[in-house]
């Protein structure tokens, strides 16, 4: 029986943080951010060099989300990848989209480290790195009218 020669994108296999991203990959999204969504706070990673602090924590209250969006604008971020964790991603997603960012919602199972220690800082940096190299696929997000109907 002949083996298949078809290659599968790394992200569909669920990339492990222990596997380094090959150096020969081209940076697709140079001004990309990664957000690790949590119930009480969100950790945000931006590329090294665009600010003094590459990772910041923002609480999940509305004023903090506006501060998050403002900080991303100051850093020159154009596109953002975030996990679809529970319902906590919804306010962040909607606010960032409203502010003009290209936002990708990604399945947390595709970007999580399967084994080993996990920290929110490492997670947001990993999401940012994968998004920089174009290795993340965004989840389907229906039109605003459908989202409004689903909220009832």
Residue positions per predicted region:
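Phosphate- and other anionic-substrate recognition elements at nucleic-acid/protein interfaces
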Residues: 1-152
């Amino acid at each position: 029986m002949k083996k298949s020669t078809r290659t599968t994108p790394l992200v569909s296999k669920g990339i492990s943080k222990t596997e380094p991203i090959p150096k020969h990959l081209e940076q697709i999204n140079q001004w990309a951010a990664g957000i690790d969504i949590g119930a009480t706070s969100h950790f945000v990673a931006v590329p090294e060099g665009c600010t003094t602090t590459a990772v910041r924590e923002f609480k999940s209250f509305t004023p903090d989300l506006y501060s998050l969006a403002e900080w991303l604008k100051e850093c020159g971020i154009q596109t953002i990848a975030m996990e679809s964790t529970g319902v906590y991603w919804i306010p962040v997603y909607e606010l960032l989209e409203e502010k003009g960012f290209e936002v990708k919602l990604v399945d947390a199972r595709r970007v999580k480290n399967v084994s080993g220690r996990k920290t929110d800082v490492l997670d947001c940096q990993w999401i940012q790195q994968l998004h920089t190299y174009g290795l993340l696929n965004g989840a389907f997000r229906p039109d605003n009218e459908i989202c409004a109907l689903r909220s009832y």
